[in-house]
């Protein structure tokens, strides 16, 4: 464990909690892409199948449980509890264009041709593009609530910090996982224009609005 | 193929 990975996990956890609280407190999931949340639930499910078979540490296991439980809770709030506030008309990204290519790629490029490893690889590839429906929805509605932009910032920063974690691990542990690194780079690049808008607008107290 | 180390990252 190193500071970058720890801060990355904290950032990821806070993004998940910000979203849960936003929906629960405001009793509304307006502006939130249910499709991205569905993809995140798939990402965590396919990545943490070794939850019971492969104990790394108490921290690792408890974080996995929290991630899986909170992602299902978020999907449940969007599609069940507060579905009346779900903005389906603007959440129209074709997720099959994300799921199918990443599934095929996970069969072609992986570390081990075993079910668990292919599912892990699929989860890594899917996570790198899972935010696209949400970013697409923000660009379609032309704006995002400030709390939603904080959620997106924390979520984007988490994988950016992981990039530094991989530099650290390459340097000091001679460990590197090219699949995770390349996917992490793609994931971070997808946030770049959002990061720009967040830093130039939201941090100056303005509302996040995209040029429609 | 070398036994792949278990993934220790979240």
From Swiss-Prot, chain A:
One Gene Ontology cellular component annotation held by this UniProt entry: COPI-coated vesicle membrane
A GO term, aspect molecular function: KDEL sequence binding
Interaction with the K-D-E-L motif on target proteins: annotated span: 47-48, 159-169
Site (Interaction with the K-D-E-L motif on target proteins): 5, 117
Signal peptide, first to last residue: none
Entry's localization field: Golgi apparatus membrane; Cytoplasmic vesicle, COPI-coated vesicle membrane; Endoplasmic reticulum membrane; Endoplasmic reticulum-Golgi intermediate compartment membrane
Annotated membrane topology: Multi-pass membrane protein
Cytoplasmic compartment spans: 25-32, 80-92, 136-149, 200-212
Membrane-side (Lumenal) residue stretches: 1-4, 53-58, 111-116, 169-178
Transmembrane residue ranges: 5-24, 33-52, 59-79, 93-110, 117-135, 150-168, 179-199
UniProt-annotated stretches for the region Important for recycling of cargo proteins with the sequence motif K-D-E-L from the Golgi to the endoplasmic reticulum: 204-207
KW Transmembrane helix (keyword) present: yes
One protein family per Pfam: ER_lumen_recept
Site-annotated residues for Important for recycling of cargo proteins with the sequence motif K-D-E-L from the Golgi to the endoplasmic reticulum: 193
Biological process (GO), any one: protein retention in ER lumen
Domain of life: Eukaryota
Keywords for the protein's UniProt record, in alphabetical order: Cytoplasmic vesicle, Endoplasmic reticulum, ER-Golgi transport, Golgi apparatus, Membrane, Protein transport, Receptor, Transmembrane, Transmembrane helix, Transport
Similarity remark: Belongs to the ERD2 family.
Function comment: Receptor for the C-terminal sequence motif K-D-E-L that is present on endoplasmic reticulum resident proteins and that mediates their recycling from the Golgi back to the endoplasmic reticulum.
Protein name in UniProt: ER lumen protein-retaining receptor 1-B
Gene: kdelr1-b
């Amino acid at each position: 464990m190193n500071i970058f990975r720890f801060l990355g996990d904290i950032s990821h956890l806070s993004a998940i909690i910000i979203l849960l609280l936003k929906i629960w407190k405001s009793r509304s999931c307006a502006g939130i892409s249910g499709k991205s949340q569905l993809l995140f639930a798939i990402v965590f499910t396919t990545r943490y199948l070794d939850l019971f078979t492969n104990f790394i540490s108490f921290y690792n296991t408890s974080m996995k449980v929290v991630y899986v439980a909170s992602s299902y809770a978020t999907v449940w709030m969007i599609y069940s509890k507060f579905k009346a506030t779900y903005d389906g008309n603007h959440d129209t990204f074709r997720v099959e264009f994300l799921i199918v290519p990443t599934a095929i790629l996970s069969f072609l490029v992986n570390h081990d041709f075993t079910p668990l490893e292919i599912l892990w690889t699929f989860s890594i590839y899917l996570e790198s593009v899972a935010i696209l429906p949400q970013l697409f929805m923000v660009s379609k509605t032309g704006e995002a609530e400030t709390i939603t932009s904080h959620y997106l910032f924390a979520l984007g920063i988490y994988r950016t910090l992981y990039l530094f974690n991989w530099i650290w691990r390459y340097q000091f542990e001679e460990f590197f996982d090219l699949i995770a690194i390349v996917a992490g780079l793609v994931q971070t690049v997808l946030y770049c224009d959002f990061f720009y808008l967040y830093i130039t607008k939201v941090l100056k107290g303005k509302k996040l609005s995209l040029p429609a | 193929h070398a036994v792949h180390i278990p993934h220790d990252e979240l």
